[in-house]
């Protein structure tokens, strides 16, 4: 049976993020880069993650910490909330929710981020992100179905 892409596109991995993660293609948009980076986390491809961080981040210094994080995180799924161009040329934003199980606690959690990407020489790079705060009465991004104030917002 074909392996579906971890990014949640519904496509086979070989026809979706694998060519990016393996370095045979370059993501043309911030959204494609973000999806391929999620897939790289799932596949434990530290080299791709480091290569797609903006050079100013000096991600090679984090190699061991990234590899260690693979042992304690089981990524469950990705939801892209919004993709937008930035105000400056060569800047883009992707808001997403990534669900995972924390291997230390066994708890299901969610990472909600608005990631910022910058383009250098026709290549997109992850530079940083902010964590949007859901409203207290909004559904919790962890996927529990509860209101944020009764779940992760306590």
Swiss-Prot record:
InterPro entries reported in the protein's UniProt record: NTF2-like_dom_sf (IPR032710), SEC_C_motif (IPR004027), UPF0225 (IPR023006), YchJ-like_M (IPR048469)
PANTHER family recorded: ADENYLATE CYCLASE-ASSOCIATED CAP C-TERMINAL DOMAIN-CONTAINING PROTEIN, UPF0225 PROTEIN SCO1677
Family, per entry: Belongs to the UPF0225 family.
Protein name: UPF0225 protein Spro_2712
Originating organism: Serratia proteamaculans (strain 568)
């Amino acid at each position: 049976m074909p392996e579906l892409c971890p990014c949640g596109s519904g496509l086979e991995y070989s026809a979706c993020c694998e060519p990016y993660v393996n370095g045979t293609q370059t993501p043309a948009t911030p959204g494609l880069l973000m999806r391929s980076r999620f897939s790289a986390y799932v596949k434990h491809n530290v080299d791709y993650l480091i290569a797609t961080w903006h050079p100013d981040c000096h991600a090679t210094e984090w190699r061991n910490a990234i590899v260690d994080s693979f042992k304690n995180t089981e990524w469950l799924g990705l939801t892209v909330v919004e993709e937008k161009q930035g105000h400056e040329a060569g800047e883009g934003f992707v808001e997403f929710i990534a669900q995972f199980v924390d291997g230390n606690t066994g708890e299901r959690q969610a990472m909600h981020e608005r990631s910022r990407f910058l383009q250098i020489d026709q290549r997109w790079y992850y530079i940083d992100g902010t964590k949007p705060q859901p409203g207290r009465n909004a559904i919790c991004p962890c996927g529990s179905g509860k209101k944020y104030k009764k779940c992760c917002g306590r």
